[in-house]
Amino acid sequence: MRKISVAAAVTLLASVGNAYAAGYQLNEFSVTNLGRSFAGIGVAGDDYSALGYNPAGMTLMKRSGMQAGLTMTEVASKIRGIGDQSGKKTDMDFMIPLPSMFGQYNVNDKLFLGAGIYVPFGLATRYGHDSFVAKDKNGVRRSELEVVDGNISAAYKVDNHLSLGVSGILRHIKGKLTSNVNSPLPNLGYSDFKVSGWSTTMNLGAMYEFDEDTRIGLSYRFKSTQRTTGHHTISVNPMYAALASRFGMGVDNRYDSVSDPELPASWILSGYHKFGEKWGTTATVKYTQWHRFHVFPAYSDNPLRPDLGVQYRWKDAWNFALGQDYYLNENWTLRAGLAWDQSPVPNSAYRTNRIPDTDRLWTSFGVSYATGNHQFDFGYAHLFMMHGKVWNSAEKDTNAKYKSYSNMYALQYQYKF
């Protein structure tokens, strides 16, 4: 099996404008938390998603229950050529669904069990086949990543102040990259690189309640490295069929592929304080260890050996969020939030068309309506993306400037047993 360095091939982790948390990490598996820009995740105590952030926070939910949510994310980007690509432009606007589901069973007032399915990582890049980005150099066409976590969790309330939690995670990753074949010959053909695989990881958490109105929580999600396998397909333009035959290839060619992507570890520190009967303030600091993201090695039996190697050299990144809840009455809760999300991309030389990531500012609001055993949650967020350039990048990508934004629309239903 011959080596091709396809950081991009399982970078797949790319999004035009990168509409989620910085890099390719996602937080969007709680609608109540989205309404406050994910401030207080794991310790807010108003839905069953804590096991996805800090499993110790499960002890805040006094009744067993379940919830299901869906976040629809609009990704919009204006891409303008710069340098040797000046005067060229393309636009992009598409929607991505992010579903989630959680359930919790309170064994007694000490032991809490839970399970969840959600998407902690994943992005998409979709350049039109006739865009100047798709026609140039590496010919980035389409990149997709979907990481689904199946989570089994347990939390234990040690006393009236301290709670501890642990989550075991079964993780499935699936990725796809479509691009032009990297060759000096024009329109040589297209390359599809598809991989999928399984891995395991875990999440540890602790929460300390100073009193019923004040608490903090700290959690750590371990990194995961998974062996992914699949196929690398090269479709050769029929006009080059004779040339392809000299390399023992036909018009359509399929090869085995392997890659070992690493998904980063992260720390979450969250706090909550209730002021009087009406106001609740939340805050979160999140630290993600992106420094290991240099190159994703990948392997293929492809005899043409297209070199898609990329040097990213990402840095660790911070996220800061502040949220406010207003408890209007026993049925209605209003909330809003603000967050700053730091990009792990160090500079324009390591920003690529596959991951044109930049810093972003979150603004959001949400509302919940509770009646009896039912609760309905709605959240909206708008992300202001800082402008970013791809310029003399490590991948020798197409020089371009990105102006992007994102809108998120989310609904969730909770049922308490």
Predicted regions located by residue number:
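Gram-negative bacterial Sec-dependent N-terminal signal peptides
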Residues: M1-Y20
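A generic secondary-structure signal marking the coil-to-beta-strand transition
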Residues: G17, T32, S49, K62-A68
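Outer-membrane beta-barrel porins/channels
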Residues: Y20-S37, I41, G81-G87, M95-F417
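Short strand-turn segments of transmembrane beta-barrel domains in outer membranes
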Residues: F38-I41, G65-E74
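Outer-membrane beta-barrel pore proteins
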Residues: I41-S64, G103-V107, A155
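Short, solvent-exposed loop/turn elements at domain surfaces
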Residues: V75-I79
